């Protein structure tokens, strides 16, 4: 937004230079992108009066003028403008003047043989826009000759190009910037009074019909008659030009002026043209969404094809304007306008943004509506415009209609609880006082300057009432703290070193998962990642209601299916057996609702050894025990003891070669060989083994002090005493159960138990097998004697006979 310092000085007392003011605004978050110092544009240009004009003797298009600039002698100036004539007041660039906009230094010269002692200037030569070819002629009479033209042309001004952040819609107006400058510099604020607009008594002049009160919560329509359309006074035109707005006519310029001053968009309709569009004398102004297929020719001359996303202003249901964006060409104010309807309205920011984007049209009005217009200043801006129209266009206000569904004005402000301790905690040390902390009076002074009202709520606490024009961006305590920091100045904060940082660390679960991944990779397994979405078809699957693809429309219930398919695909591609694992989430549904948990699964198969020369170039598939050994090695690296029990619940696994895994009495998962039928269906080798574990159960088992922080246990320096024990045991009794019983019976001296032989066949009773274990006894403080070992070993033998009914062979 372009800010005129001359205009700003009327609203707030400014004693700073333009550069100092620009620095303060930039430090407060309003970046000043450019400082346009117009005072240099017409330095040395004075008011002159053309006394006489004669044609140039040697050129048809040139004139020789005698110009009085208040000096002792008149100047002889050659001019090529077609509109130069005698007895007019003009800007004259005297000898020595420099015009930076055309890069010209005025020197005495001869033009076609006639001496010229200056130049009569046009507005373009002075850097100002102009729609008239030729020199500029002052409309005023009896101007002091030789006086500086800059105050007359608005060239005694400095323009700041200020960018407001997206959350500061209130700063898109001169009043908003004035409030900000007053708060930053502790200067006196002089907000312009809107004036009183007298509405004469009349009935039936205008009706309102708001179809969507959410999109248009407030609408004021005012009928004004006896309007005289003319050019705006010079002061108004100068202010519009300084803001980059082209003056058009007094009424249109007033609506643009109020937009710049208060940030409230307004629009003026020609009343007679509205009646023509509506084809009726009684008008009803409406606000509704467009119907598909409707069109509207806007003020830029473009015909817009409308959709239901566009919000319209209508006259008796006929489109006349894009609400909050741009008016229609059919109803614009023109030179012959004598009566008009002034629109002042509040439109929803989302509705305007959607409407603006759908037609690819942005305007000053839509930009402000999209950011949010202050609902408390609608009437002020409307009265200001009506007062100026009455003053500058002789308009008579004959009727006014208001449709207002805004909430009660008491809700236009909010109260926020603010704590002084929290302010200093967030901001840290500041260059203020001896303590380096803000005091209560500092906070009160800063927020009061912003227009907030503070009510003490205790020692160092306040209830802060936010003004309506800051309602949209001051919502929480942290917003108020930011305002305190911004107004106090970010450059006033102390330079402090950050506190000593602690070394970063991962949560225990993540550390354990990383340790688990490392253990699996150490065993030669590759980590795989599959989609969580799979084909539907299982009973317990959770199916998506709106999938992108039918093939990926259900959540996976386990990880094994994806691993088996990946193993098959790699074989088909000639890549050999894929030994891998995956950590991921699985999902299923039960009667009590949807369930999910993390799991880890793996697949092992084929010949894992390198080189076949020692095996006669033949594959040597993994046995069940070798595959189990890989998993056991992982558990050993993790420092946990897992028990195996026979299991045959999973139909995809071999019923006689499947075990469930248990840890601490909790089911950990399953391990087994693929079922022969599944192996044949997928054309897989015979020795393919899979496992799937409950990751939560595994992490709970690992999350123990003795595992997370291993304790040193000294090795015994004394020799061990070995004992072997062999017996016939029922096949239904697992080795793990037997080992558990042996460890319990030999507790104290027993160091380890190892199965070293299993035999089934001749000389073994039906339904039994021969098992042989090696038991190692050792003490940490002495060499064990036979008299110490034998009682313990006999206790083990007795426990096996008593618990399992084994037939001892040794």
Swiss-Prot record:
This is Phenylalanine--tRNA ligase beta subunit. Residues 411-495 form the B5 domain. The keyword Plastid does not apply. Its cofactor is Mg(2+). One of its GO terms (molecular function) is phenylalanine-tRNA ligase activity. GO terms for biological process: phenylalanyl-tRNA aminoacylation. InterPro entries: aa-tRNA-synth_II/BPL/LPL (IPR045864), B3/B4_tRNA-bd (IPR005146), DNA-bd_dom_put_sf (IPR009061), Fdx_antiC-bd (IPR005121), Fdx_antiC-bd_sf (IPR036690), NA-bd_OB-fold (IPR012340), Phe-tRNA-ligase_IIc_bsu (IPR045060), Phe-tRNA-ligase_IIc_bsu_bact (IPR004532). Its EC number is 6.1.1.20. Mg(2+) binds at residues 473, 479, 482-483. It is found in: Cytoplasm. Residues 716-809 form the FDX-ACB domain. Binds 2 magnesium ions per tetramer. PANTHER family: PHENYLALANINE--TRNA LIGASE BETA SUBUNIT, PHENYLALANYL-TRNA SYNTHETASE BETA CHAIN AND LEUCINE-RICH REPEAT-CONTAINING PROTEIN 47. It catalyses: tRNA(Phe) + L-phenylalanine + ATP = L-phenylalanyl-tRNA(Phe) + AMP + diphosphate + H(+). Residues 39-150 form the tRNA-binding domain. Its main location: cytoplasm. Tetramer of two alpha and two beta subunits. Belongs to the phenylalanyl-tRNA synthetase beta subunit family. Type 1 subfamily. Keywords: Aminoacyl-tRNA synthetase, ATP-binding, Cytoplasm, Ligase, Magnesium, Metal-binding, Nucleotide-binding, Protein biosynthesis, RNA-binding, tRNA-binding. GO terms for cellular component: phenylalanine-tRNA ligase complex. It comes from the Bacteria. It comes from Trichormus variabilis (strain ATCC 29413 / PCC 7937).
């Amino acid at each position: 937004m372009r800010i005129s310092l001359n205009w700003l000085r009327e609203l707030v007392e400014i004693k700073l230079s333009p550069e100092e003011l620009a620095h303060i605004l930039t430090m407060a978050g309003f970046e000043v992108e450019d400082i346009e110092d117009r005072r240099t544009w017409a330095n040395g240009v004075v008011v002159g009066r053309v006394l006489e004009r004669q044609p140039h003797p040697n050129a048809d298009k040139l004139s020789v003028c005698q110009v009085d600039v208040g000096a002792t002698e008149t100047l002889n100036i050659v001019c090529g403008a077609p509109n130069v004539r005698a007895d007019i007041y003009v800007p004259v660039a005297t000898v020595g003047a420099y015009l930076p906009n055309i890069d010209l230094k005025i020197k005495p010269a001869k033009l076609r043989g006639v001496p010229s002692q200056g130049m009569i200037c046009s507005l373009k030569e002075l850097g100002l826009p102009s729609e008239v070819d030729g020199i500029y002629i002052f409309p005023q009479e009896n101007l002091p000759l030789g006086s500086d033209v800059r105050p007359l042309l608005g060239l005694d001004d400095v323009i700041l190009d200020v960018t407001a952040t997206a959350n500061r819609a209130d700063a898109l107006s001169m009043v908003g910037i004035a409030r900000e400058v007053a708060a930053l510099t502790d200067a006196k604020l002089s907000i312009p009074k809107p004036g009183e607009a007298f509405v004469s008594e009349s009935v039936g002049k205008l009706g309102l019909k708001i179809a969507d009160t959410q999109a248009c919560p407030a609408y004021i329509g005012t009928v004004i008659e006896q309007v005289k359309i003319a050019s705006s006074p010079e002061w108004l035109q100068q202010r519009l030009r300084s803001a980059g707005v082209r003056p058009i006519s007094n009424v249109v310029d007033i609506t643009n002026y109020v937009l710049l001053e208060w940030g409230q968009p307004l629009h003026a309709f020609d009343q007679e043209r509205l009646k023509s569009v509506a084809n009726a004398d009684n008008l009803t102004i409406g606000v509704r969404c467009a119907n598909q297929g409707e069109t509207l020719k806007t003020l830029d001359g473009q015909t817009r094809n409308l959709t239901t996303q566009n919000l319209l202003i209508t006259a008796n249901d006929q489109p006349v304007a894009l609400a909050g964006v741009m008016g229609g060409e059919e109803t614009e104010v023109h030179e012959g306008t004598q009566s008009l309807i002034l629109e002042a309205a509040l439109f929803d920011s989302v509705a305007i943004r959607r409407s603006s984007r759908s037609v690819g049209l942005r305007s000053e009005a839509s930009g402000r509506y999209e950011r949010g217009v202050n609902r408390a200043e609608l009437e002020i801006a409307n009265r200001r415009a009506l007062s100026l129209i009455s003053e500058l266009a002789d308009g008579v206000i004959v009727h006014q209609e208001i449709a207002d569904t805004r909430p009660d004005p008491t809700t236009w402000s909010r109260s926020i609880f603010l704590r002084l301790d929290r302010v200093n905690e967030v901001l840290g040390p500041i260059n203020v006082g001896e303590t380096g902390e803000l005091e209560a009076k500092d906070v009160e002074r800063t927020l009061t300057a912003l227009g907030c009202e503070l009510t003490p709520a205790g020692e160092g606490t306040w209830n802060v009432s936010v003004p309506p024009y800051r309602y949209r961006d001051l919502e929480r305590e942290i917003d108020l703290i930011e305002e305190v920091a911004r107004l106090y100045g970010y450059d006033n904060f102390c330079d402090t070193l950050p506190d000593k940082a602690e070394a970063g660390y991962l949560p225990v679960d993540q550390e354990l998962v990383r340790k688990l991944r490392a253990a699996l990779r150490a065993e030669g397994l590759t980590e795989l990642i599959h989609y969580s979405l799979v084909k539907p078809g299982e009973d317990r699957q959770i199916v998506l209601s709106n999938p992108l693809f039918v093939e990926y429309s259900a959540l996976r219930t386990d990880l094994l299916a994806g691993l088996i398919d990946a193993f098959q695909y790699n074989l088909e591609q000639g890549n050999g057996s894929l030994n891998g694992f995956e950590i991921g989430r699985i999902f299923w549904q039960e009667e009590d609702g949807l369930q999910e948990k993390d799991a880890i699964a793996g697949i092992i198969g084929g010949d894992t050894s390198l080189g076949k020369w020692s095996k006669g170039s033949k594959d040597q598939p993994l046995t069940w025990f070798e595959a189990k050994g890989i998993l056991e090695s992982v558990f050993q690296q993790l420092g946990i003891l897992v028990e195996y029990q026979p299991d045959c619940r999973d139909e995809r696994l071999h019923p006689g070669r499947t075990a469930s895994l248990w840890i601490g009495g909790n089911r950990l998962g399953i391990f087994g060989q693929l079922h022969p039928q599944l192996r044949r269906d997928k054309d897989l080798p015979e020795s393919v083994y899979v496992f799937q574990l409950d990751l939560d159960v595994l992490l709970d088992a690992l999350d123990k002090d003795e595992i997370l922080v291993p304790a040193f246990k000294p090795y015994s320096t004394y020799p061990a005493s070995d004992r072997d024990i062999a017996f016939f045991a029922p096949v239904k009794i697992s080795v793990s159960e037997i080992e558990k019983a042996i460890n319990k019976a030999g507790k104290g001296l027993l160091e380890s138990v190892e199965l070293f032989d299993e035999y089934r066949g001749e000389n073994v009773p039906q339904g039994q097998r021969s098992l042989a274990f090696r038991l190692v006894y050792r003490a940490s403080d002495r060499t064990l004697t036979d008299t110490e070992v034998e009682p313990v070993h006999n206790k083990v033998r007795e426990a096996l006979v008593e618990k399992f009914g084994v037939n001892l062979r040794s």
